[in-house]
Amino acid sequence: MAAITAQMVKELREMTGAGMMDCKKALVEVEGDLEKAVDWLRQKGMAKAAKKSGRATSEGLVTVALSDDGKTVAMASLLCETDFVARGDQFQDMAAKVAKSVLDNAPADAAALEALMGEEVTQLIASVGENMQLGRFARHVKPCESSLVGQYIHANGKIGVLVFLTCGKAESVDKPEVQELAKNIAMQVAAASPMALDAASLDQAAVEREREVYRQKALEEGKPANIVDKIADGAVKKFQKEVCLMEQPYIRDDKKTITDVVRETGKAVGDEITVTGFERIQLAAE
């Protein structure tokens, strides 16, 4: 059996908020597997839904760049050690330059972006005297004239969002109601941090993991075997409403879902509007 270290117990406590002895017992029960230990604690009712380990310590900036013809958009993050440096002109200029490089060069992965911008970032590190790091990035090309992108930068550049929509008619793209919808959904993604667009695009492994957690919890609580699966199914539906963008309550009116708001806007402009995807970058999640 794997040795259970104090560091493992500490990490599990940070992830779940459970007590030290409970965390140690969980790790012993699952032979040191951290992910299984989280599930074990949840099944016993000793922990809430798994949280990301550690505190947000990253500083930096998320920036967006748009092509002159408006057909391509890029978003990128540049990380540093302190907020003081993040607010400086030199750092902000470099962050904008990174996003522009993603826009112009379409790097395939982090290594490709490092090859493009790594040397310039290193020079800035030497100049400023603080460590910096290229973070996550995304690039999107509008597939047709009837598509648009909503963008939103939140919390002093610590969260950036792109939302992709398609209308049935090209003339709908420039209508104020549609433009406002795109921005509001981008704000929704920033605030509510969905995991997926809809239930169909949700990671099924995550769904089954939630189902099993609640099945085992119901069994631990002594629920009748014939209703355990119903309890688990209900928990999964609740989970989907929390993490799927189209099923989430709208932040401006929680009596409506995002699906409702999109449908209402489409009806108002006489067109069919579809949300096709989104990208979200948050510095603390780097």
From Swiss-Prot:
Its main location: cytoplasm. CDD domains: UBA_EF-Ts. The keyword Cytoplasm applies. Residues 82-85 are annotated as: Involved in Mg(2+) ion dislocation from EF-Tu. Coiled coil: none annotated. The keyword Protein biosynthesis applies. Keywords: Cytoplasm, Elongation factor, Protein biosynthesis. GO terms for molecular function: translation elongation factor activity. It is found in: Cytoplasm. One of its GO terms (cellular component) is cytoplasm. PANTHER family: ELONGATION FACTOR TS (PTHR11741), ELONGATION FACTOR TS, MITOCHONDRIAL (PTHR11741:SF0). Belongs to the EF-Ts family. Associates with the EF-Tu.GDP complex and induces the exchange of GDP to GTP. It remains bound to the aminoacyl-tRNA.EF-Tu.GTP complex up to the GTP hydrolysis stage on the ribosome. NCBIfam families: tsf (TIGR00116). This is Elongation factor Ts. The lineage of its organism: Bacteria, Pseudomonadati, Thermodesulfobacteriota, Desulfovibrionia, Desulfovibrionales.
